[in-house]
Amino acid sequence: MPPEEWGPPIWTLFHCLAEKMKEESFPVVIKPLFGHIYKIASFLPCPECSQHAKSFLAKINPTRIKNKTDFKNILYVFHNAVNKRKNKALFNSEHLERFYAQRNLVNVFNRFIYVYNTNGNMKLLTESFHRKFVVSSFKKWMIENAKHFS
């Protein structure tokens, strides 16, 4: 599956989580959520994409993210860094907020699971196994923490 197919659902998940996180839940949610995002990025269906994502995310200390707005801005910068590298149009942050605020998080999450669990080629079989583990762990966390999202 090419990045054009699995990339948008993953970005949609990341941005929706940031947009729909309750402000008062931020201190409780940010560190584990950032950890899950890092794990998801570590096992993307494209090894080169995973390396770029891990390199970007490794520079971020989640304890220094002070609020929901900071988190949304980090994801915005991350997404635009990827778009710039791929010679794609850059996003306007206001567009992102409006777009992702309208999404249903359950539907977004289910779409993410569908594309993220895709089986790659045989060379990526180990990564496919890891993706299934990442999804299982993240799904459990999301169920336990659904109250922190609108």
Predicted regions mapped to residue ranges:
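Aromatic-rich, lipid-facing transmembrane alpha helices and their immediate juxtamembrane interface loops
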Residues: M1-S150
